[in-house]
Amino acid sequence: MAMASLARRKAYAVVSSSRSSVFLTSLRGFASGSDENDVVVIGGGPGGYVAAIKASQLGLKTTCIEKRGTLGGTCLNVGCIPSKALLHSSHMYHEAKHSFANHGIKLSSVEVDLAGMMAQKDKAVSNLTKGIEGLFKKNKVNYVKGYGKFVSPSEVSVDTIDGGNTVVKGKHIIIATGSDVKSLPGVTIDEKKIVSSTGALALTEIPKKLVVIGAGYIGLEMGSVWGRLGSEVTVVEFASDIVPTMDAEVRKQFQRSLEKQGMKFQLKTKVVGVDTSGDGVKLTLEPAAGGDQTILETDVVLVSAGRTPFTAGLGLDKIGVETDKIRRILVNERFTTNVSGVYAIGDVIPGPMLAHKAEEDGVACVEFIAGKVGHVDYDKVPGVVYTTPEVAYVGKTEEQVKALGVEYRVGKFPFMANSRAKAIDNAEGLVKILAEKETDKILGVHIMAPNAGELIHEAAIALQYDASSEDIARVCHAHPTMSEAVKEAAMATYDKPHSHMKSWLLLHSLLFIFVQQFTMTWR
């Protein structure tokens, strides 16, 4: 079967309601008369557990297999959730230590209780994993704890965590095994001196110095956590920029913000050697283009150079499932592989490696299996970096729009002109909107702000429904709110900003340029 390219990964289907009803009825009847499952999901992460619950809700007999022993995958256990817990706790500490006095709050001393911080994180994770198990019981999803691998296209052998083995049969088997930390040549992760994101979430003491290899989402977030708690953080990145998927203008402001917080960057740099023989770690660095080597000493190294699909040991070769050069499973617009009855979703297939994308994959895949309509548009999946400030974006960057040759307009609004931001003394950042010049259709939205991860969803809805910047601008936004900056940027996009804001924009633009030049000169 010919596989669809990533550019075609927009899942659409047109199936009549009568056909859907007949198909679903037949599946229900089959489930009630056989031990075979209608759907088997390998992997209990965001994509897998959501797919399993949705399948059961659609009347399909469903089993989910998870090797970890707790549901939620990397995201819930050692990723999204624990990192956000530590980001919030470290932010509260940093605010208490550095910002409370500005608001008239005086503290005699502020100390970090790292064990308490970790306990709060672990409690959040535990409650949420138990919550998913509760959802499985409520929705009658059979849950098998163990490592599953194919023995045939319709059978999965599971080595259970209690030492046993069982074979799970299914008419439709969904691979949702997620991704794993990408290793670097010559850099061995021991989760002590050289840690992955998993180890960085469980350090027992605050390192004096931390080197982060990789300037992506995970590296910058974890670097922020330990930087706020007192670590001297240096980020080493092979590329010329941090977060390459980010709009260039926003990225530059974002990097300046992180540098003001004390984070150091060594871009266009590669790690060519690691020495852990002493008390700390000595990294041998070299310019990406080649050149003189330097030594960087640190206490802990966080390897955050991306993730790789977890497809090894699943028996894919045995049943003939096709993968690409980096072991991503190839699927068509219905998430089916080249093997009939076998599907794949989430991080193991092409597309953004994001938990919410995996969830959408899971729902759409199961809807297709049930004869319904599934839909995922990867061009409209929002991304968020949960630092302070946060950076969120959806749609295209200005660089991507230029590359397409589309005539466009840009509207911007700085938070330094937003009433709520000024009132809470947190006015760093901006909203940037890109819209097609002729139609005013929104092409992309980029936000750098304290709560950009929440603000971005107004833009996500707008893109999903092909809205114009004027559509957003004509929506009444409550005052004073941070969301008014989105409205103002939308008004600026179609050239109708509030008259009193024009002078504000001009004044603050000039001030911003002056501060930039002064800062660069001072440095």
From Swiss-Prot:
NAD(+) binds at G214, A215, G216, Y217, I218, G219, L220, E221, E237, V271, G306. GO terms for molecular function: dihydrolipoyl dehydrogenase (NADH) activity; flavin adenine dinucleotide binding; leghemoglobin reductase [NAD(P)H] activity. SUPFAM superfamilies: FAD/NAD(P)-binding domain (SSF51905), FAD/NAD-linked reductases, dimerisation (C-terminal) domain (SSF55424). It is an enzyme of class 1 (oxidoreductase). The keyword Mitochondrion applies. Residues 1-30 form a transit peptide. It is found in: Mitochondrion. One of its GO terms (biological process) is 2-oxoglutarate metabolic process. It catalyses: 2 Fe(III)-[leghemoglobin] + NADH = 2 Fe(II)-[leghemoglobin] + NAD(+) + H(+); 2 Fe(III)-[leghemoglobin] + NADPH = 2 Fe(II)-[leghemoglobin] + NADP(+) + H(+). Homodimer. PANTHER family: DIHYDROLIPOYL DEHYDROGENASE, DISULFIDE OXIDOREDUCTASE. NCBIfam families: lipoamide_DH. This is Leghemoglobin reductase.
